[in-house]
Regions:
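A glycine- and small-residue-enriched flexible loop/hinge signal that marks low-structured segments
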Residues: 1-218
Length: 218
């Protein structure tokens, strides 16, 4: 485990590990989580591409992808107080990161990182939200059905979060959403929640919605 709380392993090992999920007969899985995005933009895109490849091949799972850490956070010697970029810079960085990633209805892109307490290190750290978005889908499965949207005030609440590294305003949310990226926001009175339910599909289609893709998987 490195200083940011991520596994200290190479991209090659992670990609090889995800390759084990390609066999849908031997491995039963619904959600493919990117996990840490501590590498640079190109490394994180390579991991995202692998996850999408696995999901597309299986056709019974969805990949959850967050932007690379450096798009919004610059780590310092104090891991509890890294430098966070301006919202304007983060918006541009996140859109630029996701833009080259292939169009697919088997992936969900989110807007960033939450600040949470890590009980294992007894400290706070920024963690990518892909695990949380996958968790919202799992919770929706349990409490409702896969064809319900996991977003919004009713089902989109993100738990175990103190704050967000990036809380986009309306104009920034609109830019993100039109770029296939689901904003996660802080809403007064509602807390931190997922504010979009798009897949990574670039064309206007029923399959550009998470609940529709999951209905057909179900």
């Amino acid at each position: 485990i490195n200083a940011t709380g991520a596994l200290n392993s190479g991209l090659d090992d992670i990609i090889s590990g995800y390759g084990l999920f390609e066999n849908d007969t031997a491995v039963d899985v619904d959600f493919l989580l990117q996990g840490s995005a501590q590498g640079g933009a190109e490394q994180t895109r390579a991991l995202a591409t692998k996850l999408i490849q696995v999901a597309e091949a299986r056709k019974d799972a969805i990949a959850f992808i967050s932007p690379y850490r450096g798009s919004m956070i610059t780590d310092t010697t104090d891991q509890e107080a890294p430098t966070v970029l301006s919202d304007a810079d983060i918006t541009d960085n996140v859109i630029d990161f996701f833009d080259p990633i292939t169009s697919t209805s088997y992936a969900v892109f989110d807007s960033g990182y939450k600040y949470m307490f890590d009980r294992f290190s007894n400290g706070f750290r920024y963690v990518p939200l892909n695990g949380d978005i996958g968790g919202l889908c799992a919770r929706t499965d349990i409490n409702q059905f896969p064809w319900f949207s996991p977003a919004g005030t009713a089902r989109g609440a993100i738990l175990n979060a103190v704050k967000l590294a990036y809380n986009p305003n309306k104009e920034q949310r609109d830019r993100l959403y039109s770029s296939r990226i689901n904003p996660v926001i802080f809403s007064p009175g509602s807390g931190i929640l997922l504010f979009g339910d798009k897949t990574g599909y670039a064309k206007a289609s029923a399959f550009d919605r998470i609940n529709v893709r999951r209905l057909f998987i179900f």
